[in-house]
């Protein structure tokens, strides 16, 4: 039997994506100014980034990056366990651990890498199992597959389903893993109930709070703190640095013994160059602002309320989200692509989310809000969405990139 040719395979897959009108296109951003971004020579108001607190261009954050780069250079030059672990890395780990009320923290290059590291280091036996919400982020699901343990999934937010899956896999060590805030729906996991399930089934409870930390809870400490939980109930938690904190990278906080085990055994940690010290210095400045500036979260809450009230007034189907992620269901791919194009024509950049990222028939506009948005910009967006809906409803639809 002839060996499959990889070039022929990818050519066939490309043709299939073209036929399904699911080709993905990168849009090039020329410049950014707050929530405004220049694309193809036009300035658009963006409602599509994860810069929830507006920290990515904050003066103190940028100045910290510039100062550290002038002092330490552009990169860490080695992995953490060789000579890449700088004072800046240690300081940031301690700051985030203190902020979230955890004894220990460990920096990673990205949330995807961190999720792989956690599962690869902890679920190393064939009988081990990771039970997950069906709508968890791809990095959590892929991490289980790459770690080699068993993957069991339960219906979205279904606590009893999580219990059934754990009971059905009594052999081996177990982890119950969930997003804190779900990135495509914007809703929040029932963490208190899930923590009880994990305890009853002797499973380690792991929360990926990429979209919660900085936004929810006291001092922006995230979903876990907002639910009144801590390290006793959630022994490991993921924090990404590229969402509300406006930078890049990730941190796993947790029990000291667990974090030490990750540092000593997790291959994605051991065999990766450490984050640039300048980037880490910028994130440290962002963390301190996020802890201090409650006004950013207060403004976000006001903007979220204004958007939901306006969208509801005009008959849009909202999802159960009180977070900066505000999806508007459009149904078919052709509809959401036409809506997104109409909004761009009106001067707004809003992400069109379609299968396979979301289920068939659940395509949506993913509106994301920032503390830097103004009430006037939110109102203008709502009016533009209404106009886009009216235009799209009167024309034949065809999905496009």
Swiss-Prot record:
Annotated Pfam families: Aminotran_1_2
Enzyme class: transferase
Transferase in keyword set: yes
Record PROSITE patterns: AA_TRANSFER_CLASS_2
Catalytic reaction annotation: 6-carboxyhexanoyl-[ACP] + L-alanine + H(+) = (8S)-8-amino-7-oxononanoate + holo-[ACP] + CO2
Modified residues (N6-(pyridoxal phosphate)lysine): 243
UniProt: pyridoxal 5'-phosphate binding residues: 111-112, 183, 211, 240
Entry keyword Zinc-finger: no
EC code: 2.3.1.47
GO terms for biological process, alphabetical: biotin biosynthetic process
Residues that hold substrate according to the record: 24, 137, 357
Cofactor: pyridoxal 5'-phosphate
Family stated for the protein in its record: Belongs to the class-II pyridoxal-phosphate-dependent aminotransferase family. BioF subfamily.
Subunit structure comment from the entry: Homodimer.
NCBIfam families: bioF
Name of the featured protein: 8-amino-7-oxononanoate synthase
Protein's organism: Xanthomonas euvesicatoria pv. vesicatoria (strain 85-10)
């Amino acid at each position: 039997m002839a060996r499959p040719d990889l070039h022929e395979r990818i050519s066939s897959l490309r043709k299939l994506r073209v036929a399904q009108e699911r080709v993905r296109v990168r849009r090039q951003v020329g410049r950014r100014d707050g929530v405004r971004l220049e694309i193809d020579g036009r300035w658009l108001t963006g409602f599509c980034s994860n810069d929830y607190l507006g920290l990515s261009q904050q003066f103190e954050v940028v100045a910290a990056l510039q100062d550290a780069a002038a002092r330490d250079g552009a990169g860490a030059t080695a992995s953490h366990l060789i000579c890449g672990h700088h004072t800046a890395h240690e300081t940031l780990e301690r700051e985030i651990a203190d902020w979230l009320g955890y004894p220990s923290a460990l920096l990673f290059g990205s949330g995807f890498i961190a999720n792989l590291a956690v599962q690869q280091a902890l679920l190393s036996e064939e009988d081990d199992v990771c039970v997950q919400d069906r709508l968890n982020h791809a990095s959590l699901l892929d991490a289980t597959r790459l770690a080699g343990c068993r993957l069991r999934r339960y219906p979205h937010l279904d606590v009893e389903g999580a219990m059934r899956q754990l009971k059905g896999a009594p052999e081996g060590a177990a982890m119950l893993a969930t997003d804190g805030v779900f990135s495509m729906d914007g809703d929040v996991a029932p963490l208190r109930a899930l923590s009880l399930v994990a305890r009853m089934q002797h499973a380690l409870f792991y929360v990926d709070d990429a979209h919660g930390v900085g936004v929810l809870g006291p001092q922006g400490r995230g979903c876990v703190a907002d639910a009144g939980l801590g390290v006793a109930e959630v022994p490991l938690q993921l924090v990404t640095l590229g969402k509300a904190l406006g930078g890049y990278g990730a941190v796993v906080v947790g029990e000291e013994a667990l974090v030490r085990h990750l540092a000593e055994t997790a291959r994605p940690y051991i065999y990766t160059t450490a984050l640039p010290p300048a980037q880490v210095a910028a994130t440290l400045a962002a963390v301190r602002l996020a802890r201090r500036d409650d006004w950013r979260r207060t403004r976000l809450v006001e903007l979220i309320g204004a958007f939901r009230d306006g969208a509801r007034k005009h008959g849009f189907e909202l999802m159960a989200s009180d977070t900066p992620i505000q999806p508007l269901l459009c149904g078919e791919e052709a509809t959401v692509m036409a809506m997104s194009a109409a909004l761009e024509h009106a001067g707004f950049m809003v992400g069109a989310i379609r299968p396979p990222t979301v289920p068939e028939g659940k395509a949506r506009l993913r509106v994301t809000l920032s503390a830097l948005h103004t009430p006037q910009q939110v109102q203008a967006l709502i009016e533009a969405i209404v106009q886009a809906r009216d235009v799209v409803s009167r024309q034949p639809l065809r999905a496009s990139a």
